[in-house]
Amino acid sequence: MNLLDVIELNARYGDALDRFDLAAWKALFTANAAYRAQARENFDRGLPLAAIYLDGHGMMADRIMTIEKTLVFAPRFTRHIIGLPTLVDESTARTPFLVVQTVTTTLPEILATGCYHDTLAVTPDGVRLASRNAVYDNALIPNSLVYPL
Protein backbone atom coordinates (compact mmCIF):
# COMPACT_ATOMS: atom_id res chain seq x y z
CA MET A 1 0.00 0.00 0.00
CA ASN A 2 1.28 3.45 -0.83
CA LEU A 3 0.18 7.06 -0.49
CA LEU A 4 -1.57 7.04 -3.89
CA ASP A 5 -3.68 4.04 -2.83
CA VAL A 6 -4.91 5.96 0.22
CA ILE A 7 -5.56 9.13 -1.80
CA GLU A 8 -7.63 7.09 -4.29
CA LEU A 9 -9.58 5.43 -1.46
CA ASN A 10 -10.38 8.83 0.06
CA ALA A 11 -11.39 10.26 -3.33
CA ARG A 12 -13.81 7.37 -3.86
CA TYR A 13 -15.11 7.78 -0.31
CA GLY A 14 -15.93 11.48 -0.73
CA ASP A 15 -17.37 10.94 -4.20
CA ALA A 16 -19.67 8.13 -3.02
CA LEU A 17 -21.05 10.24 -0.16
CA ASP A 18 -21.43 13.37 -2.30
CA ARG A 19 -23.41 11.34 -4.87
CA PHE A 20 -25.45 9.68 -2.08
CA ASP A 21 -24.26 6.29 -3.34
CA LEU A 22 -24.23 4.63 0.05
CA ALA A 23 -23.74 1.14 -1.41
CA ALA A 24 -20.47 2.36 -2.98
CA TRP A 25 -19.56 3.96 0.38
CA LYS A 26 -20.13 0.66 2.22
CA ALA A 27 -18.04 -1.23 -0.37
CA LEU A 28 -14.98 0.82 0.67
CA PHE A 29 -14.97 -0.96 4.05
CA THR A 30 -13.95 -4.51 4.91
CA ALA A 31 -16.87 -6.74 5.92
CA ASN A 32 -16.20 -6.43 9.66
CA ALA A 33 -15.03 -2.79 9.62
CA ALA A 34 -16.07 -0.20 12.19
CA TYR A 35 -17.16 3.34 11.34
CA ARG A 36 -17.54 6.11 13.90
CA ALA A 37 -18.29 9.81 13.75
CA GLN A 38 -17.02 11.16 17.05
CA ALA A 39 -16.55 14.57 18.64
CA ARG A 40 -12.91 15.49 19.16
CA GLU A 41 -13.54 16.10 22.87
CA ASN A 42 -14.59 12.46 23.33
CA PHE A 43 -11.75 11.19 21.14
CA ASP A 44 -9.13 13.19 23.05
CA ARG A 45 -10.44 11.87 26.38
CA GLY A 46 -10.55 8.28 25.15
CA LEU A 47 -14.33 8.15 25.58
CA PRO A 48 -16.24 5.76 23.30
CA LEU A 49 -19.33 7.97 22.83
CA ALA A 50 -19.92 8.68 19.11
CA ALA A 51 -22.74 10.36 17.16
CA ILE A 52 -22.65 7.42 14.73
CA TYR A 53 -21.19 3.99 15.50
CA LEU A 54 -21.46 1.20 12.94
CA ASP A 55 -19.79 -2.17 13.46
CA GLY A 56 -19.60 -4.21 10.25
CA HIS A 57 -21.45 -4.30 6.95
CA GLY A 58 -24.68 -5.41 8.66
CA MET A 59 -24.96 -2.23 10.72
CA MET A 60 -23.89 -0.16 7.71
CA ALA A 61 -26.67 -1.77 5.63
CA ASP A 62 -29.20 -0.98 8.40
CA ARG A 63 -28.07 2.65 8.43
CA ILE A 64 -28.35 2.86 4.65
CA MET A 65 -31.87 1.42 4.71
CA THR A 66 -32.87 3.85 7.44
CA ILE A 67 -31.56 6.81 5.44
CA GLU A 68 -33.09 5.67 2.15
CA LYS A 69 -36.43 4.35 3.36
CA THR A 70 -37.52 5.80 6.67
CA LEU A 71 -35.82 9.01 7.68
CA VAL A 72 -37.59 12.26 6.92
CA PHE A 73 -35.36 15.31 6.58
CA ALA A 74 -34.95 18.31 4.33
CA PRO A 75 -33.21 17.53 1.02
CA ARG A 76 -29.51 18.28 1.32
CA PHE A 77 -26.27 17.97 -0.57
CA THR A 78 -22.82 17.49 0.85
CA ARG A 79 -19.39 18.21 -0.51
CA HIS A 80 -16.40 16.44 1.03
CA ILE A 81 -13.08 18.21 0.73
CA ILE A 82 -10.51 15.65 1.81
CA GLY A 83 -6.87 16.60 2.36
CA LEU A 84 -3.74 14.59 1.79
CA PRO A 85 -3.26 11.66 4.15
CA THR A 86 -0.38 11.13 6.52
CA LEU A 87 0.68 7.49 6.62
CA VAL A 88 1.40 6.78 10.27
CA ASP A 89 2.65 3.26 9.53
CA GLU A 90 1.93 0.52 7.01
CA SER A 91 -1.71 0.13 8.05
CA THR A 92 -2.82 3.42 9.64
CA ALA A 93 -3.39 6.91 8.30
CA ARG A 94 -4.71 10.31 9.36
CA THR A 95 -6.42 12.59 6.86
CA PRO A 96 -7.96 16.05 7.40
CA PHE A 97 -11.47 16.67 6.08
CA LEU A 98 -14.04 19.42 5.61
CA VAL A 99 -17.70 18.68 4.88
CA VAL A 100 -19.94 21.45 3.56
CA GLN A 101 -23.70 20.92 3.59
CA THR A 102 -26.32 22.66 1.50
CA VAL A 103 -29.99 22.34 2.38
CA THR A 104 -31.82 23.27 -0.81
CA THR A 105 -33.48 26.33 0.73
CA THR A 106 -30.43 27.78 2.53
CA LEU A 107 -26.87 28.90 1.94
CA PRO A 108 -24.11 26.32 2.26
CA GLU A 109 -22.70 25.82 5.76
CA ILE A 110 -19.78 23.97 7.21
CA LEU A 111 -21.13 20.72 8.62
CA ALA A 112 -17.86 19.48 10.08
CA THR A 113 -14.10 19.78 10.01
CA GLY A 114 -11.83 17.18 11.45
CA CYS A 115 -9.56 14.24 10.81
CA TYR A 116 -10.14 10.68 9.67
CA HIS A 117 -8.24 8.17 11.80
CA ASP A 118 -8.05 5.02 9.68
CA THR A 119 -6.90 1.46 9.89
CA LEU A 120 -6.36 0.17 6.36
CA ALA A 121 -6.35 -3.29 4.84
CA VAL A 122 -5.13 -4.55 1.49
CA THR A 123 -7.78 -6.81 -0.07
CA PRO A 124 -8.16 -8.46 -3.48
CA ASP A 125 -10.35 -5.44 -4.37
CA GLY A 126 -7.67 -2.95 -3.33
CA VAL A 127 -7.12 -0.89 -0.20
CA ARG A 128 -10.16 -0.84 2.08
CA LEU A 129 -11.04 0.69 5.43
CA ALA A 130 -10.79 -1.77 8.32
CA SER A 131 -11.91 1.10 10.56
CA ARG A 132 -12.58 4.80 10.14
CA ASN A 133 -13.09 7.19 13.02
CA ALA A 134 -14.25 10.54 11.62
CA VAL A 135 -13.24 12.82 14.49
CA TYR A 136 -14.95 16.17 14.04
CA ASP A 137 -13.53 19.30 15.67
CA ASN A 138 -16.78 21.17 16.24
CA ALA A 139 -18.74 20.45 19.41
CA LEU A 140 -22.03 21.21 17.65
CA ILE A 141 -23.33 19.79 14.38
CA PRO A 142 -25.87 21.94 12.49
CA ASN A 143 -29.32 20.33 12.71
CA SER A 144 -28.48 16.63 12.75
CA LEU A 145 -25.87 14.19 11.58
CA VAL A 146 -27.77 12.05 9.08
CA TYR A 147 -25.08 10.87 6.68
CA PRO A 148 -21.61 9.62 7.47
CA LEU A 149 -18.89 12.28 7.42
Model-predicted segments: where are they?
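A beta-strand edge to alpha-helix "cap/lid" segment located at domain peripheries
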Residues: F77-I81, T86-L149
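A generic "alpha-helical surface" signal
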Residues: L4-I7, A16, A51, G58, ...
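Short, low-complexity N-terminal intrinsically disordered segments enriched in polar/charged residues
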Residues: M1-A31
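Short, hydrophobic secondary-structure boundary micro-motifs
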Residues: K26, R36-A37, A130
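Short helix-to-loop capping/linker segments positioned immediately adjacent to catalytic or ligand/cofactor-binding
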Residues: Y13-G14, T70-R76, T104-T106
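A general boundary/transition motif marking the beginning of the first structured unit of a protein
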Residues: M1, Y13, P48-I52, P108
